[in-house]
Amino acid sequence: MKKNLLILVFFGMILFIPVQVFSQSRFPEGTTAGRTDADPNRQAGRIPFIDFSIREPSTNKDVAFSVQLLIFITLISIAPSLLLLMTSFLRLSIVLDFVKRALSLQQVPPTQVLNGIAFFLTLFIMWPTFTQIYNNAYKPMSEGQIGIEEAYREAEKPMRYFMYKQMQKNPTHIRTFMAMSKLPKPDTLADVPTHILIAAFILHELTIAFQIGIFLYLPFIIIDMIVASILMSMGMIMLPPVQISMPFKLILFVMVDGWGLLFGKLFESFL
């Protein structure tokens, strides 16, 4: 114990002893004055000074610009949620997860890979809509032809049309949310507020994704039931049927070109 205490005291003295550091300079022999090679007029790179201050606006234009900047930053922060809920990503990600579970695959493909596949399929499906937003909203705003408010309205139109197009054949969810908001029955797309359209679109996408998932599960459930009955008839009760049925599911999925059929039907469902 005393030995450990002495070691701690020794290292503590080393840490707290002041160390004098001498700069390297060239001193002629026999003199105490020296010359350094550094240029006295040369300044080292400095970190720029950034000042965040609150001041009173001089004109109404300053107030409007501050509000616009705040709205723009808010939209950037919620952009991932908008991508998830207002595009085809929601349906694609849910269906791909259903496929993974129906094939009894636990780790392959990973969730990050499925999300990446859903993301790029979303870009492929939404590319015409994004092109309209770029041509009608972003490009004129960047060139100074329109303001932020008009750019927002122009960007909103293609997204509203895409969401309404998916529910045009079955507008039940739109009517439900309109009734919950105590609004009259809409006759056209212009009569539906954006917040109601987004809520109805989310519910519609969840419904469609689960319907597709049920149809995907049916053939694989039949394989599980056949394998389980065969194992029970052979007396192999302790053997998990999932381990035996998974290779047969993969063989069936590969033989019918499952990925090609799945992606093709998903793409057609958005047309």
From Swiss-Prot:
Phylogenetic classification of the source organism: Bacteria, Pseudomonadati, Spirochaetota, Spirochaetia, Spirochaetales
Subcellular location field: Cell membrane; Bacterial flagellum basal body
Family (UniProt): Belongs to the FliP/MopC/SpaP family.
Membrane-crossing residue ranges in chain numbering: 5-25, 70-90, 113-133, 190-210, 212-232, 244-264
One Pfam family matching this protein: FliP
Organism of derivation: Treponema denticola (strain ATCC 35405 / DSM 14222 / CIP 103919 / JCM 8153 / KCTC 15104)
Membrane topology annotation: Multi-pass membrane protein
Protein name per its UniProtKB record: Flagellar biosynthetic protein FliP
Main location: membrane
